[in-house]
C-alpha cells in the first residue's frame, strides 16, 4: 500500500520549537508553534523549504514524548532573530508519501510501520528520529491529496 523511496536532504538552518506532549496535545502545540514560527520566518524573508515535525520518542495518549517543529529559513538571516534556531545536518531519508486523510493518529502509524519495515528489509539503519515533512498546503488540501512524507533519516545502503 505504501511506496517507499529514498532521497538526499541538504543541510538546513531551521527555526525550532520543542515540547514534551501527549498525543491528544499535539494539535494544540502544532497550531500555537506554527503561528509563532511562521511569523518569525516571515520577518526573515520567509520559509525556504517544507516544515517538518520530528518525533524524538514515541508519543501516545498514555506516554508523553518530545516533539520538535522545524521551519527552514535562510541561514544568512538566522542571526537576526532571538527565536531558537539550529542546523539540521544533511542526510539520506527513506520515506513514503501520504494523503491528508491518513495524517491522523492512529491511522498514520501504518505509514511509519511501512517505512520501518523497508529499512529492516533493505539492511540499512535509522540514524535520527523519524519526521513528518509537510510539503503542501495542509489546510487547503482535500482528504485524498498528498500532503505529507513520513521520513526516516538512514545510513546510505552501501555504508551499512
Name what the model sees in each region.
Residues 1-160:
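A solvent-exposed interaction/effector surface
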Amino acid at each position: 500500500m505504501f511506496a517507499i523511496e529514498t532521497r538526499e536532504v541538504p543541510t538546513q538552518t531551521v527555526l525550532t520549537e520543542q515540547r514534551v506532549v501527549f498525543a491528544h496535545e499535539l494539535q494544540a502545540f502544532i497550531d500555537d508553534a506554527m503561528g509563532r514560527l511562521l511569523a518569525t520566518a516571515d520577518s526573515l524573508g520567509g520559509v525556504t523549504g517544507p516544515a517538518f515535525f520530528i518525533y524524538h520518542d514515541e508519543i501516545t495518549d498514555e506516554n508523553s514524548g518530545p516533539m520538535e517543529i522545524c521551519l527552514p529559513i535562510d541561514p544568512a538571516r538566522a542571526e537576526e532573530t532571538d527565536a531558537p534556531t539550529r542546523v539540521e545536518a544533511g542526510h539520506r531519508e527513506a520515506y513514503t508519501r501520504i494523503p491528508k486523510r491518513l495524517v491522523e493518529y492512529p491511522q498514520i502509524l501504518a505509514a511509519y510501520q511501512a517505512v520501518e519495515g523497508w529499512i529492516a528489509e533493505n539492511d540499512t539503519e535509522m540514524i535520527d528520529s523519524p519526521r513528518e515533512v509537510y510539503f503542501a498546503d495542509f489546510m487547503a488540501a482535500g482528504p485524498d491529496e498528498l500532503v505529507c512524507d513520513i521520513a526516516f533519516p538512514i545510513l546510505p545502503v552501501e555504508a551499512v
